[in-house]
């Protein structure tokens, strides 16, 4: 019998090799670290195609052969436990049970007999295709392939034939049979229990990869028209405009067609193939961080809402591709209506996009339909992705969040959704953004051009090596838990019929939106282009010798490796020299040779474009830069005083740069930075606790470069604190106008070509933060005046700014 099975598997291997292509995702780490301990697998189906596909995947992962045998204390065991046999083709025949329970019991008993055994059991889930089940009763090829629960051999033949090249093999974290035996017993009940847990585990995992039942557009429209809120708004609109409800329904249907996506798995599969081909030609690598947490969320039944930063139109494609590659279902994506042009609009809809207008413009019918459509997506269990910034950042810094989508998300929760809603901030980083040149023109006053097919073709024509792409999944934010802390009685506002807008909604959403942006920044990705942009913009003439730039890169990297901005920050493993070589290959810098060696500089065009990449990571160096500036400006400074000054200035920049750090985090990073500087012999500390810089001129240049990174922010603070102290009382509007005027003057004098430096909204944010920190008060007439603590913070700031800047402000 064994020989016959082996011969059968041998016959199947060749056709399966042609028909099956496995995408492997593993959560199991360091399984082979204990080579003397036996390894077993558990799978859903006792199927030859499943086992042979698993064998191929295990070979690629250097894992033991699942078709092999394991001998424990002289007793032989199959390495793979199968939970269910295939359903018989004839309905009157009953499916026999597998030996999984008996083998599980025998394995647990071996752990009772021999205390030295600690066998590992790896759940291996094989998912053929990513087609979710559909809400339709008629049998067709789609439903035939979608239903994979214990398929008979004929159904499995078609599944392998049509879906074999889109097979996902998911290795979960191995669990210890020793732990089960010691804590749950080794009887038949214990064996049944862990097999039951495995079945549930596979079910949740499959839902996470394929998604819930697919609802078609017409079904969604029917559900929306049956929604009480939509019914009410149609009735109200008909009465107010004195037309028939049928006419309003026609308008509503047009809006639904404009909004709704048209999700197609076949389109997604085709798009994934195209994108895989494209990324291989565009990017050296796509680096993904923290995806394991994401998979666990999906498997635990969370409603995942992706909230990425928005750098480029490429974001839509890159993040969607990565989500699919990580074995998760494609979310429904909120896209701007400007992307709904032929043929991109149709393609995006098939990929799961739904479209949103830039402004609802007081259109109650549209806003109601859109809100209820979003709520329906959540209710049906579909993941969603939207950009809280509302549009692409033109400066490289994250933008102030638009809160509309977040508000509608919480309103959906107030309809009584059972599953937890969890926001996943996503940091998207690039070493080349194809729109950067266009962004600079728009910031310089050029009119923004609308999207079109011509623009897409033009962009494709200019495709070249874009370096690396980065997708960092941030710390998940459970909205239910957030509301429990912010509004303990929020559940009192739940109403499954009428959409609620309680008084606490707006302020709570504002807090949540800020936390989202902070968590995006918390998960930043450092890269060679951004680091070189940061360092060269901190140099006097935007130029350094090649050797000096490599040294600076190593210093900047070392600071983050030993005193990181956050645990989520990703840092390149390469040396400074390796990063510079890579950036030179991307043509981002100009190399000039002279008798002394090579000079690295920025051309006039690159100077403005590289500022974009500098701004991507500037926030990660705020604390190290402030520490270096304080040491640079003081011959000696007490440690406690230094920490307080860093805390005070960082608090003023928190809203402007969306820093997640509170005073405790700032203190911890400050002390770590000081320790690193001491270990590098750049700074020294006396027994009395005073810090000062070393006398080594070569080392001091590194400190100067780091300190210069924060200079523009300090200049803006100096302008505001000086003008408030000197000109108060004055209105907020007058202060903003005067601050912008001086900022423009300084930008000319110091050659600061930075739109954010003179942006009125950015100055307004800084003024608001300074007021929130208690340095600005209001007089009886509602005008701004300096508070009693203004003098202290003003002194701190102006002592960190060059005298030439202060003279310009004083004039």
Curated annotation (Swiss-Prot):
Superkingdom assignment: Bacteria
Motif, HXXXXD motif: chain positions: 309-314
Main subcellular location: membrane
Membrane-topology descriptor: Peripheral membrane protein
Keywords assigned by UniProt, alphabetized: Acyltransferase, Cell inner membrane, Cell membrane, Lipid biosynthesis, Lipid metabolism, Membrane, Phospholipid biosynthesis, Phospholipid metabolism, Transferase
Any one Pfam family match given in the protein's UniProt record, by short name: Acyltransferase
Lipid metabolism in keyword set: yes
CDD domains reported for this sequence: LPLAT_DHAPAT-like (cd07993)
Pathway involvement of the protein, from the record: Phospholipid metabolism; CDP-diacylglycerol biosynthesis; CDP-diacylglycerol from sn-glycerol 3-phosphate: step 1/3
Stated family: Belongs to the GPAT/DAPAT family.
Protein known as: Glycerol-3-phosphate acyltransferase
Organism from which the protein derives: Colwellia psychrerythraea (strain 34H / ATCC BAA-681)
